[in-house]
C-alpha cells in the first residue's frame, strides 16, 4: 500500500469540513434534547485502517457505545459516532423518553446525517446514511467488523458536545476506501477555495 500522505493544508480543509458538517445537525439536536447543543471539532486524524491500532484517533481501548451505519452514494463507506457508555447514556437522557438506547441512536444518527449531507453537498451527488444501529464493542473491533480493505482510510474526528451544561467527548469515524480518497480530497479542496 502507498503510504498515506495528507498535507497540512488538506488537514486544515478536512477540519473545516467536519466543523461545518457537525454544525449542520446542531439545530436538530437542540430540537431533540430541548436545549442548545454545540458540537466542536477538537482534533482530526486520517489513518489507514491497517495502521489504526497504532496511529488512529481512538476514544478508548475499552468498550464504547456507538452508532454505526453505511454511507451510500458517490463515495460509499461506513460512518460511526462513539462515546463512553456513561456519556452515551447521559446524552440520551437529555432527549427524555422511556427508551435511552433509541434516543442515543437518534441523537448520533442526527449528527452523522449532518456529516453525510455535507459530504453529499461537496461531492455534488447523493449521499445517504443508512442502517444506523447501536454497537457496543471496542472501536478497533467495530471498524474491523466492517470488512473494509486494510488500505481504507479512517477519518477520525474528536468532538466536544455541549448540551444543557454537560460536556461530552465523542469520536466520529468515516471510512473511505483508498480508491475514493483522491475524489474526496479534490472535492473538499474545491469546496474550500
What label would you give each PLM region?
Residues 2-193:
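Composition-driven recognition of glycine/serine/threonine/acidic- and proline-rich low-complexity segments
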Amino acid at each position: 500500500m502507498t503510504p498515506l500522505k495528507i498535507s497540512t493544508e488538506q488537514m486544515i480543509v478536512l477540519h473545516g469540513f467536519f466543523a461545518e458538517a457537525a454544525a449542520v445537525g446542531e439545530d436538530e439536536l437542540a430540537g431533540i434534547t430541548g436545549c442548545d447543543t454545540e458540537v466542536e471539532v477538537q482534533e482530526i486524524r486520517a489513518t489507514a485502517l491497517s495502521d489504526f491500532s497504532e496511529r488512529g484517533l481512538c476514544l478508548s481501548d475499552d468498550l464504547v457505545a456507538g452508532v454505526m451505519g453505511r454511507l451510500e452514494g458517490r463515495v460509499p463507506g461506513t460512518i460511526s459516532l462513539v462515546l463512553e457508555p456513561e456519556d452515551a447514556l447521559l446524552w440520551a437522557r437529555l432527549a427524555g423518553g422511556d427508551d435511552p438506547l433509541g434516543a442515543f441512536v437518534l441523537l448520533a444518527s442526527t449528527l452523522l446525517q449532518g456529516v453525510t449531507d455535507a459530504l453529499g453537498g461537496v461531492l455534488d451527488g447523493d449521499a445517504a446514511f443508512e442502517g444506523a444501529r447501536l454497537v457496543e464493542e471496542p472501536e478497533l473491533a467495530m471498524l474491523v467488523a466492517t470488512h473494509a480493505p486494510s488500505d481504507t482510510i479512517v477519518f477520525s474526528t474528536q468532538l466536544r458536545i455541549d448540551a444543557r451544561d454537560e460536556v461530552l467527548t465523542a469520536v466520529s469515524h468515516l471510512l473511505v476506501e483508498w480508491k475514493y480518497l483522491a475524489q474526496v480530497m479534490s472535492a473538499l479542496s474545491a469546496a474550500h477555495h
